[in-house]
A protein has these predicted regions:
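Predominantly the C-terminal beta-signal and adjacent terminal strand-loop region
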Residues: 76-80, 87, 149-192
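Hydrophobic membrane-targeting alpha-helices
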Residues: 13-17, 100, 148
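Gram-negative (and chloroplast) outer-membrane scaffold detector with strong preference
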Residues: 21-22, 56-125, 135, 146, ...
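Outer-membrane beta-barrel and related beta-rich outer-membrane complex signature
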Residues: 37-39, 81-83, 123-125, 167-170
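Cleavable N-terminal export/targeting peptides
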Residues: 1-22
Length: 192
């Protein structure tokens, strides 16, 4: 009997959960603009700006508070004094907690803060050069969702993500490399 009542209660809750529209999925185009820092300083070391597609999912815990998981990957060229040292990919999944101001009007601004875990792969640098394969760092964001349909939104977003790794030559550490990009995004979101 208890199992039957539980099953009926769960089934009855499904329409409420669906109507609540607790999820949002966005697809964005990102411009990743590294803010390169080295320590000790390596003059002229740079990481290229790149565009990439991104998908993210936001779960709304309350109408004002959401948790967003950002998924994107990018291939960057690393240069020294304008000369190519090679290329590397990084995958920085980022989880942020967001506060959405005025969650009911057409224009819905938000701010967020969180963490990222970055893994480097397909590292193809000059002979002997390597980078660490992982990095943990913080993330800040601000953005706005602009309603264009009942559940569809144009999204503008900016993030600052802290990504650090070590550059090594033959196993000897040369410098700490902070890629630390500012990430500009524009896209479309659907709330469901």
């Amino acid at each position: 009997m208890k199992k039957t009542l539980l099953a009926v209660a769960l089934i009855a809750a499904i329409p409420t959960a669906v109507q609540a529209e607790n999820w949002m999925m966005r697809v964005r185009a990102l411009d990743i603009v590294p803010d390169v820092k080295t320590s000790p300083t390596v003059a002229g070391l740079d990481v290229s700006d790149e565009w990439t597609p991104e998908v993210d999912f936001t779960y709304f815990i309350t109408p004002n508070i959401g948790m967003e998981l950002i998924l994107a990957t990018q291939r960057h060229e690393v240069t020294l004094g304008g000369a190519s040292l090679g290329k590397l990919n990084h995958l920085p999944p980022t989880l942020t907690v967001q506060y959405h101001f005025n969650p009911t009007p057409t224009i819905k601004p938000y701010i967020g803060a969180g963490l990222n875990y970055t893994t480097f792969y397909n590292v193809d640098l000059a002979p002997g050069l390597t980078v660490d394969k992982h990095s943990f760092g913080g993330a800040l964001q601000a953005g706005v969702d602009i309603a264009v349909t009942q559940n569809g939104y144009i999204n503008l977003d900016v993030k600052k993500i802290w990504i650090e790794t070590e550059v090594r030559n033959g196993g000897v550490k040369l410098t700490d490399l902070g890629i630390n990009p500012i990430v500009w995004g524009i896209g479309y979101g659907f709330r469901f």
